[in-house]
């Protein structure tokens, strides 16, 4: 009997569902000959990098304001024809077949949303067929490291309807002994922050990723609020709970200038702003500190701050191994944000993570601002021993679903579970 007996793909179906913003996205099911079923849902970003794989939308103004994904759903039928009868255990072969079927560099024909939904659903089906949790199927026996969460508790930029320029102000429980405790610490700081905001007469409505979205006088004020909340919750800033930012600077870059807090800056001035913030606050990670194509200044930023703080490329690298390789060769950044839908297949995502690891770069597994109840990224973080995960704040169930999945994984691992903050895989507190 062949090793892949029963794991052949028998059927692939897809449907249009809604994400956390009420916009359509793609859900796929992969059915195997042995009756195993894998289900996956694809997220969608608000601030998207220019070089991301193509998210196929219908552009029909009569449905969902043109945001429908019926074309992508229909394209899954063509994918099914190409993959039927193949083994779900051959993830790389299946992903290559879909890439070849699409025939474009950015998956524009079939849509990265169609391809990724099938890619992930296939992995889930294969894991189910082997009676393994997804993290164990993908990561093998060494998949036992729980990531330090980057908790986006103050939202700005494209993720919120407020006047804050920087997109995310995050807390990282780097000093916690376990993921369970890290989650508790984060939740306590989140609720302390709510009280701090109320006491100051500031809004406590939340943005796309579940963080608060008050109007503030400056980006620095957001950091001050986080320090106040951390201390109010009984923790030590830096040592126990560190700070991180997603500047998302491409969103306020125009004609060679960065405009934040109402002032336009040359690239050197923007680097100076970030350096000042790092010197004044216990910041351990900065994402997209400069514009996605500003490679020369990214190199300068890395030379100035790379030994002090984690510099994460999101729009810069877009989970693309070719762009990451360019960054490695030029000495740009020291970490890569991993978003499955930026590249469009599980295989290419794993290749990017592997390249980062071999090159001394860290990987941060990430959600998108438009999410679903899918928890694949939680398993991916553990499978790859990435050590860090970005999956939003401590509210909105599409964010909490990932945290709760990590709690279940930690419980299943028992005494074999390691928390990245406790063993030094996450950014160090200072």
From Swiss-Prot:
Phosphoenolpyruvate binds at residues 339, 368-369, 390. It is an enzyme of class 4 (lyase). GO terms for molecular function: magnesium ion binding; phosphopyruvate hydratase activity. Mg(2+) 1 binds at residues 246, 287, 314. Coiled coil: none annotated. Its cofactor is Mg(2+). Keywords: Cytoplasm, Glycolysis, Lyase, Magnesium, Metal-binding, Secreted. The active site is at residues 209, 339. (2R)-2-phosphoglycerate binds at residues 167, 339, 368-369, 390. Pathway: Carbohydrate degradation; glycolysis; pyruvate from D-glyceraldehyde 3-phosphate: step 4/5. Belongs to the enolase family. It catalyses: (2R)-2-phosphoglycerate = phosphoenolpyruvate + H2O. Gene3D superfamilies: Enolase-like C-terminal domain (3.20.20.120), Enolase-like, N-terminal domain (3.30.390.10). This is Enolase. Catalyzes the reversible conversion of 2-phosphoglycerate (2-PG) into phosphoenolpyruvate (PEP). It is essential for the degradation of carbohydrates via glycolysis. Crystals are solved as a homooctamer, a tetramer of homodimers; in solution is primarily monomeric. It comes from the Bacteria. Binds a second Mg(2+) ion via substrate during catalysis. It is found in: Cytoplasm; Secreted; Cell surface.
